Amino acid sequence: MAIHLLGIRHHGPGSCRNVLEYLQELQPDLILLEGPAEAETLLPCVLNEQMEPPVALLAYQPDQPQNAVFYPFAEFSPEWQTIVYALRNEVPLRFFDLPLVHSMAQNQKPHNTTEEQQEEIIPTVYRDPFDYLAEAAGYADGESWWETTIEHRKDSADVFQAVKEAVTALREELPEHTSPRDQLREAWMRKMIRTAQKENFERIAVVCGAWHVPALENMPKVKEDNELLKGLPKIKIECTWIPWTYDRLAFRSGYGAGIESPGWYHYLWHHPQDDGTLWISQAASLFRKKNMDISVAHVIETVRLAQVTAALR
């Protein structure tokens, strides 16, 4: 029995291709995917011809519908392609994150936290932990570092091992970046992995956010996780699919796992081998629709300049 941990970015064409290549080679007999267990019954809808991403899973509390969460998916989201792979190949797939009946109840009142302790919680300025890797490698921020080293990577060999080692180092140096909520989620994920191990699956693929991988590889004692999960609050929730947009998928919308340019990632997913010519041609077409004089010569020179600048970088 083997557990294969695939640490991903939630929306990225490179991560997406890496996951698909790994799954096709591994041929798993079970896939555990980061997501809410309550939504598993909605997964067959993914193959419906009218289901066109971007879409989102909406989970809400029926008696308080303002208490809701969204799980967006784009065509280039590793989770989306993992679901498609599982359905088309008839591989069992389970969402193994902390159930929403607990996590949404926890959002209303922190688990194992008194009213006095809640008042003492002071908001802090969040810094992407990958910013530290970016700084060491000479990049402006974690976003640009991840895009260059992972999303634009042509060779997927050992990429998941490299990501795991990088995140392990970050978590060791930055323990404060793992929140109590993440600790609860990871305890539940480990519980679901242990359950799957007892069912005699031979090749289990675990697809989750890269930050969680070290916590799922180095498991504490069962007793420790059970103690952490003891007495979780619970509410009733319902789930459904809703349409989504690339604007809402962008980081600027306030979405925590958002990306800078969803349209660019959509392009990379569909045209991974393009040298920039098609992208610039599409941009030129948009300019022409605005009655701007853009010639073929402009396109050629722009592509040439972009390629030379990229080579210098």
How should each PLM-predicted stretch be described?
Residues 1-313:
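Compositional signal for N-terminal targeting/processing segments
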